[in-house]
């Protein structure tokens, strides 16, 4: 029997999780996408099907820190702080965390912890 690839496992896990993780206007969804080189996070209102705010390691605001930003935990925590700051500015205090099928470990955990420390509740 062939071994299931890691990417396919992540996709299956994400499909399972999305049945239960539905963001609303009162409590939007914080969705995380992790690639090999970058990490992306969005605060999404699923009722209105609209992205409230987003942040990533390729963000224009973080362009001066481009040399420091890569696919590591410290970059993820910088993105988490930036996302929380933008969400608070838009009036979002509570979110539902959608890890995107990734394990809650490493870069995903660093982003979540930084967003929590910056004031988001989940």
UniProtKB/Swiss-Prot annotation:
Residue ranges that the Swiss-Prot or TrEMBL entry lists as coiled coil: none
Keyword Transcription: no
Keyword Cell division: no
GO biological process assignments: translation
Gene Ontology terms: cellular component: cytosolic large ribosomal subunit
A single MF term (Gene Ontology): structural constituent of ribosome
InterPro entries reported in the protein's UniProt record: Ribosomal_uL18_bac-type, Ribosomal_uL18_bac/euk
Keywords: Ribonucleoprotein, Ribosomal protein, RNA-binding, rRNA-binding
HAMAP family the UniProt entry points to: Ribosomal_uL18_B (MF_01337_B)
Family: Belongs to the universal ribosomal protein uL18 family.
PANTHER family found in the cross-reference section: 39S RIBOSOMAL PROTEIN L18, MITOCHONDRIAL, LARGE RIBOSOMAL SUBUNIT PROTEIN UL18M
Role this protein plays: This is one of the proteins that bind and probably mediate the attachment of the 5S RNA into the large ribosomal subunit, where it forms part of the central protuberance.
Subunit structure: Part of the 50S ribosomal subunit; part of the 5S rRNA/L5/L18/L25 subcomplex. Contacts the 5S and 23S rRNAs.
Identification of the protein by name: Large ribosomal subunit protein uL18
Organism (species): Prochlorococcus marinus subsp. pastoris (strain CCMP1986 / NIES-2087 / MED4)
Gene label: rplR
């Amino acid at each position: 029997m062939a071994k299931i690839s890691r990417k396919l496992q992540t996709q299956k896990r994400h499909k399972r999780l999305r049945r239960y993780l539905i963001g609303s206007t009162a409590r939007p969804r914080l969705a995380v996408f992790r690639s090999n080189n970058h990490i992306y996070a969005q605060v999404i209102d699923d009722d209105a099907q609209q992205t409230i705010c987003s942040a990533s390691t390729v963000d224009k605001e973080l362009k001066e820190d481009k040399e420091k930003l890569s696919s590591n935990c410290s970059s993820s925590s910088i993105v988490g702080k930036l996302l929380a700051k933008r969400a608070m500015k838009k009036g979002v205090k509570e979110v539902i965390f959608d890890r995107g099928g990734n394990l809650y470990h490493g870069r995903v955990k660093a982003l979540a912890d930084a967003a929590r420390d910056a004031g988001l509740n989940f």
